[in-house]
């Protein structure tokens, strides 16, 4: 894998994780 692919993969993971935190926070978990 090249650097761009790794950067995109990391960005998507962080984005998905932050979205999950927002959803869980609104649900009171």
UniProtKB/Swiss-Prot annotation:
InterPro entries: Cytochr_b6-f_cplx_su8_sf, Cytochrome_b6-f_cplx_su8
Range of residues in the leader sequence: none
CC annotations in GO: chloroplast thylakoid membrane; cytochrome b6f complex
Keywords from the UniProt entry: Chloroplast, Electron transport, Membrane, Photosynthesis, Plastid, Thylakoid, Transmembrane, Transmembrane helix, Transport
Residue stretches spanning the membrane: 3-23
Location relative to the cell: Plastid, Chloroplast thylakoid membrane
GO biological process: cytochrome complex assembly; photosynthesis
Family: Belongs to the PetN family.
Annotated function: Component of the cytochrome b6-f complex, which mediates electron transfer between photosystem II (PSII) and photosystem I (PSI), cyclic electron flow around PSI, and state transitions.
Subunit-level organization: The 4 large subunits of the cytochrome b6-f complex are cytochrome b6, subunit IV (17 kDa polypeptide, PetD), cytochrome f and the Rieske protein, while the 4 small subunits are PetG, PetL, PetM and PetN. The complex functions as a dimer.
Protein name as annotated: Cytochrome b6-f complex subunit 8
